[in-house]
């Protein structure tokens, strides 16, 4: 995963 995907996954984990 790259930085962009990492940020997307982080937001998804936050329930956004």
UniProtKB/Swiss-Prot annotation:
The keyword Secreted applies. Conversion of fibrinogen to fibrin is triggered by thrombin, which cleaves fibrinopeptides A and B from alpha and beta chains, and thus exposes the N-terminal polymerization sites responsible for the formation of the soft clot. The soft clot is converted into the hard clot by factor XIIIA which catalyzes the epsilon-(gamma-glutamyl)lysine cross-linking between gamma chains (stronger) and between alpha chains (weaker) of different monomers. GO terms for biological process: adaptive immune response; blood coagulation; innate immune response. It is found in: Secreted. GO terms for cellular component: extracellular region. The keyword Signal does not apply. Keywords: Adaptive immunity, Blood coagulation, Coiled coil, Disulfide bond, Hemostasis, Immunity, Innate immunity, Secreted. Cleaved by the protease thrombin to yield monomers which, together with fibrinogen beta (FGB) and fibrinogen gamma (FGG), polymerize to form an insoluble fibrin matrix. Fibrin has a major function in hemostasis as one of the primary components of blood clots. In addition, functions during the early stages of wound repair to stabilize the lesion and guide cell migration during re-epithelialization. Was originally thought to be essential for platelet aggregation, based on in vitro studies using anticoagulated blood. Heterohexamer; disulfide linked. Contains 2 sets of 3 non-identical chains (alpha, beta and gamma). The 2 heterotrimers are in head to head conformation with the N-termini in a small central domain. A long coiled coil structure formed by 3 polypeptide chains connects the central nodule to the C-terminal domains (distal nodules). The long C-terminal ends of the alpha chains fold back, contributing a fourth strand to the coiled coil structure. This is Fibrinogen alpha chain. It comes from Neovison vison.
